[in-house]
């Protein structure tokens, strides 16, 4: 090839589920478009997925349980899917492994030698080997009981592969039940073994409901969405540890003093260039209107922050509506030019004196050089009685 010719950008595949069905889409990054391809069916509803570091395999956690504290099912698995390096197509790879209860989140460690799985009810953290043939393998025996807090929601391994962090949200208080405290459970991590847990829980975990975290790609900064308080907290990593003091606090909502319904901060992703941070705001409460339950109002949006490159402090620079209800998940393409948000359920909304339905689906945004988002299009998806729960993009 003539060295003066520009190389073709690498292809990107997007995967999104409806229940147990996981559909592959080609991603046209330049055109900000998704092209639907084939669908594979997993043993039960997709909960989360994580690619192998080689980007040739996708590990998918599934469950027949309902979300939250809903009815418990009996089918819980991790399945390996092979990613075709040319097309992105998925095919089953080997046998699935059984899990004891519903997995809510999963990741691999940095070299993809082990799979870490978070369970919410009961809260737990388990580690499974990745076999030499890339299939999921046996559980790693731990030295003792694991302190998994209350209602785990995410597990991540620090970029240096030395710590595993279990994000435990706790539960909001109700008129009849006291608040369950939240915490970040930080473990030393080596070869799949978890030891020496440290619990980061400001004020004993009261008014601290963390949901999701992400790491800066080059600096020792960690960003945590506080779901129940609608905040974004910044933590600093020092000498291989996490400083338990909150370095910076930022709002996630555009109108924090004008809450029309329950607001819940959600997914967090740092831009690949490390200059911007993105978080999801979710609302879905309903009110009666003409005998039907309709959306009560609230912020379903992506908040964009500029990151101070000397301190790590995030400053909100944009709040943009996602054009649907409850953006549970979003992801940024590896080139940092596209953001796609997934909405899990259809919702009825008022339209003057009428009622219309906003379908579930995928909203596509361009990311500008200034980090700000521009809405391009939404792909409506008929989920029937199922749920869109996870989506993500993988560079081929």
Can you describe what each PLM-predicted range is?
Residues 8-10, 52-55, 108-112, 159-161, ...:
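Residue-level detector of Asp-centered blade-edge/turn motifs that repeat once per structural unit
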Residues 16-18, 67-76, 118-123, 173-182, ...:
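Short, solvent-exposed loop/turn segments at conserved positions within beta-propeller repeat blades
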Residues 25-32, 80-88, 127-137, 186-194, ...:
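Short loop/turn segments immediately following beta-strands, especially the blade-tip
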Residues 39-43, 95-100, 143-148, 200-206, ...:
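Surface loop/turn motifs at the tips and blade-to-blade linkers of beta-strand repeat domains
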Residues 45-47, 102-104, 151, 180, ...:
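Beta-rich catalytic cores
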Residues 89-159:
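Asp-box/WD-like beta-propeller blade repeats and closely related beta-sheet repeat scaffolds
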